Amino acid sequence: MESSNQFLGTERIGKLMQKYAIPCIISLLVGALYNIVDQIFIANASYLGSYGNAANTVVFPLTVVALAIAVMIGDGCCAFVSISLGQNEVPKAKRSVGNAVVMCLVSSIVLTALYLIFADTILAMFGGTVNAETYHHSQEYFFYITLGVPFYMFGQAMNPIIRADGNPRFAMIFTLAGAALNIILDPIFIFGFRWGMMGAAVATVIGQLVTAALAVWYLLHMKIIRPEKGDYRLKGSICGRTLTLGMTSFLSQISLVAAMAAINNMIRKYGALDAVFGQEQYAQIPMAVVGIVMKFFQIVISIVVGMAAGCIPVVGFNMGAKKPTRVKELFTKLLLAEATVGAVALVLVELLPWQLIALFGSANESVYYTDFAVKSFRIYLCMIILACVNKACFIFLQAMGKAAESTALSMVREVVFGVGFALLLPRFFGLDGVLYSMPMSDILTFLIAGYLICKTYRELSTKGEV
């Protein structure tokens, strides 16, 4: 049986990148906007300010845990489907989608229950006890955000699956709809009703609910890989292969959570020893500042990951169809595009940090806030070009079916280097050591990624063409 995706093996690479990467970038940017928009409105509410910002920073890694599970299932299914379609095995692709839906629903319910039961312990683990006001806001925000976890996970998991069905445009639209609603509701709930952190969270959950509802509608109207009733029965081999293919996406996100937990706790520990930030009224500033730096980084990485993840169906199809020359061409163009994005971001953080900070309510804050924020942007993101190239390498290896290499590289970056430097450098440089942990991690990771890039080119050059 021929699938309608055969054009993936014949269309110009540049055109395919535009078709698949641009909607994926927009989808990821829009998805990132949920938390970023919350933080912008929270920061500009005078009754929340840096305390609300710090609370958002505490809760953010916990939403990434949900995202990690969702993208493991969704990206794994996307890769499975793309390879299956390249081999003309459509029934297997449909079964993968059905199994992915069930795995997502079960895991989201379990995670929601765990969050509700162990909320206080979890918040303390991620630095929520920096001061009493921050902890109060963290509790409120986390409770309502947790109620939306099933909707959030389902929408995020379905996004790459919808792209694999050959409809990247709808994947973009259904995510955009939820985020647009969130942007509309945030100022109403935060400034109009003065619901504070609860208002920001409720606006987010409503947006996620709309996205999930649209994803369900599309699932029932898929073009190529709509599951039949029997496809929803879990099959061990398909679940295992899906999770294996998506493991890099999971570890990339979950290891980032480990790094953020280490960073948050080092900020809490060494901020308390600082002459300024050791004072109760300023204790939340380092946590809030690192949070806004990470939000800017999230925007950049959404573009980078969107480019690479959008190419997964193209890579998977051409690998399955034994067309290595096209895969090599795609890899080259992707690396150049990712490096360009990183270069633009570097110019912004080095030359215009004040403008970036102003988005997050600096007018309502002390000079200590602004000074530390400028320094944080310039140090923490000084190697952002390498970070972009590293991310592209992680995802491309995953798309080629090299799950072991991709997973290992991702783990080394976030856990060995990320957590390691976050714990080590503050011992010698205090609070500044936390800021230097990211560029150091990116430099060492790039040395390994460079080797894998060269190795991948050699392998693609020696593969036979069909």
What are the residue ranges of the model-derived segments?
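Short alpha-helical transmembrane segments in multi-pass integral membrane proteins
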Residues: M1-A21, V81-G148, G192-M247, V315-M383, ...
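N-terminal transmembrane alpha-helices
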Residues: G9-L48, P61-G76, F80, L105-T112, ...
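Transmembrane helical elements of multi-pass membrane transporters/channels
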Residues: K19-D38, Y144, G178, G207-T211, ...
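Residue-level hotspots within pore-lining transmembrane alpha-helices
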Residues: I26, V30, Y34-V37, A66-A70, ...
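Short runs within selected transmembrane alpha-helices of multi-pass transporters and secretion channels
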Residues: S27, Y144-R163, A171-A179, A200-A213, ...
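Helix-terminus/linker motif at the lipid-water interface of multi-pass membrane proteins
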Residues: L29, L33-A54, L123-A132, I188-W195, ...
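Small-residue hotspots at the loop-to-helix junctions and early N-terminal turns
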Residues: S50-P61, S138, F142, A201, ...
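Small-residue-rich hydrophobic transmembrane alpha-helices
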Residues: N53-A113, Y152-A171, M287-V347, L351-P353, ...
